[in-house]
Amino acid sequence: MKIIINNDFPVAKVGADQITTLVSAKVHSCIYRPRLSIADGAAPRVCLYRAPPGYGKTVALAFEWLRHRTAGRPAVWLSLRASSYSEFDICAEIIEQLETFEMVKFSRVREGVSKPALLRDLASSLWQSTSNNEIETLVCLDNINHDLDLPLLHALMEFMLNTPKNIRFAVAGNTIKGFSQLKLAGAMREYTEKDLAFSAEEAVALAEAESVLGVPEEQIETLVQEVEGWPALVVFLLKRELPAKHISAVVEVDNYFRDEIFEAIPERYRVFLANSSLLDFVTPDQYNYVFKCVNGVSCIKYLSTNYMLLRHVSGEPAQFTLHPVLRNFLREITWTENPAKRSYLLKRAAFWHWRRGEYQYAIRISLRANDCRWAVSMSERIILDLSFRQGEIDALRQWLLELPKQAWHQKPIVLISYAWVLYFSQQGARAEKLIKDLSSQSDKKNKWQEKEWLQLVLAIGKATKDEMLSSEELCNKWISLFGDSNAVGKGAALTCLAFIFASEYRFAELEKVLAQAQAVNKFAKQNFAFGWLYVARFQQALASGKMGWARQIITQARTDSRAQMMESEFTSKMFDALELELHYELRCLDTSEEKLSKILEFISNHGVTDVFFSVCRAVSAWRLGRSDLNGSIEILEWAKAHAVEKNLPRLEVMSQIEIYQRLVCQGITGINNLKTLEDHKIFSGQHSAPLKARLLLVQSLVLSRDRNFHSAAHRALLAIQQARKINAGQLEVRGLLCLAGAQAGAGDLKKAQLNIVYAVEIAKQLQCFQTVLDEVCLIERIIPASCEAFTAVNLDQAIGAFSLPRIVEIGKSAENKADALLTRKQIAVLRLVKEGCSNKQIATNMHVTEDAIKWHMRKIFATLNVVNRTQATIEAERQGII
């Protein structure tokens, strides 16, 4: 998307009249966002920009006016901020501006007939100006608001519907009152709060326009996420050139909310707005109960219709919520003005959810009230719901610790839930002690024992301790014994199996269990498990190296209400941690210490082996790229120490392999230690292939450093074989580059260049950008002779072309088709065919013979069932292969 930074919009053709000066001032130092333009002639005739204050509605409108005038076409600008505007005033203003363009000439009307005073008469007059009906004219109406009378709004809508087709309208406001006719007629396109919010790219462009130099792009992207793109807030925070822990407490933001929103609405609605901020979401009945009133319906309707301050919760049309930053601002006002009622109101809100069976919200709000005593009488069903279906790990841990100790022994299910929480808090030893004690009890009458929740907790808990083989056996056994009578437990067990298969690169088995798990979890409303299914799918994408697919999975997870990304703090933090490696690979890592420290704190308390290693490896690699070798090794040593403390041997071995790789460049001899590492029992399990591949790569680098290039190439080939066996794309890319380095060191530049080209092509297809950059940097330091090979294939240009922090979204279906139909080399050939290269040019580019390219083309034609290059390109694009 092209973004134009505007300091002086090209309005030379417009003329230096008052309206031009007024409109030009509105866009000074703003950015032009083409995605908000109405330039498309096939678009509806009316464009409505509607959102709360500060979303750039007027700016978008002004840019449209200037764009229209710059093209030499007539444009009318009218601001309706004044509540005293009448239909006569509006009609007269439009006529006056149209007359300057000679669109209408009422002086030629016969004597005794005055200019139209009503909009419907003006519409008729415009139809009579047949000579001008081909000239596209834009009428911009700014500040459409609820203060305008409904008859006036209806007159405006009728005017828009009844004017000639060459007249188009752009409208900006904060109300939807009066627009029903336009919606019904299908004559209107809406740009809402979501559309008007800044994207990360737009915020970066704004920072450039404002010469903001102190905030890196990654931090700007994080800022946009935190304020959900609210343009006014982005501007205020960029000008400060530093983020704030509590954005609503920033003086400029506080003043803006107070002046433009809070003080701008009537008193009764201010009270409602402030009260609503105490609730996670608001419904009329809930509000009326909590605050003992009867005006919930009218207030919600007024604020959502006339100010756009309340928005629908996705998938829940009866629920409304506030923008999170605005909600924090309003909460501060509420607690400051009336602190004594805090606990009382929160308890009423918690009890409201409790009565409706919404225990997740009830527990969360009661924790904010610092009072959980009333919840001691929870039934077993409720506790199980919170533990297994909602996955409220943090809230449950806090709540359970506050319960009286006697309650623990009165209800065995409390101990089971606590064991569940301990497993997901990396305290497996304590959890197993609890389970052992409970297993020794022989009370067969307890419901918790009949449903075998204890055995399920043990089965899934083993996976959190990285005891995958034991966990898989116990989960399968539990499903066969109890799955038919316990859908919630079956969904949890199937989800655990999915995570195990993703961790062990068993992707064929993963596909089968995912389909079954999704069906069961949907039936059982297993929200916590849905989040973990996304984790399993994301792990598969990362393990395969398919970063475009991984990005798509994250996006889907964040918008899927079943995954509870917004409702569950635990699930949200889990995805933040997983996303770190993806962002590093795409070169858009948020390196703010605050963000990193939060993620590191989370994984130290809750991170299973795969998540823990993913985060530490990404942070270590990032530090190494900044020439911070000590910091790079430090976090890996921390991971290793954590692994020893928690008895996680796989994490210990992976961390040690990464440490050895960091030490290779320093000339430290470690080949003997690497050989002894192979004897570790972890290399005989299901995780052996990726572990062996990682170890072989480090061994190859060590041998190359010692100039034993033949053995180094052999180790690299073995690593490639291991990677291909499990479809680990990133490891294959690294293996090919290590092989090329060894070959270059041995003097075989032709083979080295061939493998470099192949590695780069795989990286392009996978979009694993940083892998290539990191590996090449390492190899060139260890094997100086390899620099010539990398230079010969113009690697800098190749990397520069695909290492930008923008990716092509690749759907899963396309990923699978590409893997199933064509080889990576064939896809590489097709890409070059699409660029117009001849067979000879492709052969030169890929460092192979022309006959080899012809052979690949015949295979491609046969696979895609086509007869020529053009058809092959079209069919491959249709199937999403290229």
Swiss-Prot record:
SMART domains: HTH_LUXR. CDD domains: LuxR_C_like (cd06170). Induction: Protein expression is autoregulated and sigma S-dependent in stationary phase. ATP binds at residues 51-58. One of its GO terms (molecular function) is DNA binding. Pathway: Hydrocarbon metabolism; alkane degradation. Coiled coil: none annotated. GO terms for biological process: alkane catabolic process; regulation of DNA-templated transcription. It comes from the Bacteria. Residues 815-880 form the HTH luxR-type domain. Keywords: ATP-binding, DNA-binding, Nucleotide-binding, Plasmid, Transcription, Transcription regulation. Gene3D superfamilies: Winged helix-like DNA-binding domain superfamily/Winged helix DNA-binding domain (1.10.10.10). This protein activates the expression of alkBFGHJKL operon in the presence of alkanes. This is HTH-type transcriptional regulator AlkS. The gene is alkS.
